[in-house]
Amino acid sequence: MSTLQEQVRERALALGAPFGLVPDKVTVPIMSEDPESVKGLSVIARRLGAASFAIRLANALLVDEDDDETRATIRETSRNYGVDYDMTQREISLLHGDNTERDIEDVKGSEEAMAVVAWALNGGPAPVDPTKPSDIDAAHNVVIRGEHIQKLMEQAELVPQLEVAALIDLYRLYAEQGIGDQKLVRARRVALEWFLVRENDWLRIRF
């Protein structure tokens, strides 16, 4: 066990203590992944931008699945923003109207993952409370204020890798001990585990 691994676990336990995390019951191994393997700013910023546009479209389609005007608007604005090629296949299907109802629901269900990604770009407080939903509008506003992906990347600053690693470890521990709203815990883990893998589509990640 390295000193860095110990620091990650100690930080995770400290973050989770106010929410009932019990150190004596921990059996999840300390994360073996190197904190330096966390995705870089460019990849994270592009995922945030693409997800934000796709989620806004999903919300509109849940009201009216035949809202072609909003589809066209999001296609244009995401292209102008520079993230249309960063969308997952499921998100692209929403843009072009060849999606299923499940696709809409899945993209809508990515809101908490998007909020985690916004946090990683210093876009809000750390989502350490496993019972409190994130401020989704604040996450969208990180993208809106950017105006374009290049400006977003210039404005953004990644939180320290140790903090990202600690949050990954924390949510693995929350899942193990059944702490908090497990639907919320799982939704956030989608993004947290995505930070460590090469897969672009976070909805395809299994843990």
Go through each PLM region and give its residues.
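Extended, charge-rich alpha-helical interface modules
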Residues: S2-F207
